[in-house]
């Protein structure tokens, strides 16, 4: 019995980073990288054709950022996205935009193995995520959406 591989699309404008991510993810027997995009415009065209289970996306790219792309695209097309960036300050923006997780790009080659291991684990977890579309009529951002709050303790 063979299990279905997780189909991943990599979106990154840096050829070096893109190649590293593709090579690292492809080394796992349960993951198949089915394509890549060099920016968000390219991603918008390729995502419907490739139909990935999970997308890894750089945050900072020319044109539209990964975060802006998620805010525009994810409400109508729910796909688990893991944002990848060298900027830790973008973590909350990424999650607020709908990313299921965030991975920090390594600052040096010394941390590459740990980065690939972390990203691979998060891709496998994200593949099981149930991402819901947001109704177009909602008119609220994720930070404005209703949330649960705990009652004060007695």
Where would I find each of the regions flagged by the language model?
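Strand-loop microenvironment adjacent to phosphate/nucleotide-handling motifs in alpha/beta enzyme folds
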Residues: 1-154
């Amino acid at each position: 019995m063979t299990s279905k591989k997780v189909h991943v699309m990599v979106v990154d404008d840096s050829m070096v980073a893109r190649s590293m991510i593709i090579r690292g993810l492809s080394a796992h027997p349960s993951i198949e990288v089915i394509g890549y995009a060099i920016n968000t415009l390219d991603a918008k065209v390729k995502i419907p054709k490739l139909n990935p289970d999970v997308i890894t996306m750089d945050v900072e790219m020319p044109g539209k950022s990964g975060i802006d792309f998620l805010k525009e695209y994810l409400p109508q097309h729910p796909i688990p996205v893991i944002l990848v960036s060298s900027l830790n300050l973008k973590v909350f923006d990424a999650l607020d935009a709908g990313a299921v997780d965030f991975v920090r790009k390594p600052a040096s080659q010394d941390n590459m193995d740990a980065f690939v291991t972390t990203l691979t684990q998060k891709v496998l977890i994200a593949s099981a995520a149930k991402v819901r579309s947001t109704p177009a009529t909602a008119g609220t951002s994720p930070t404005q959406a209703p949330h649960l709050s705990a009652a004060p303790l007695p």
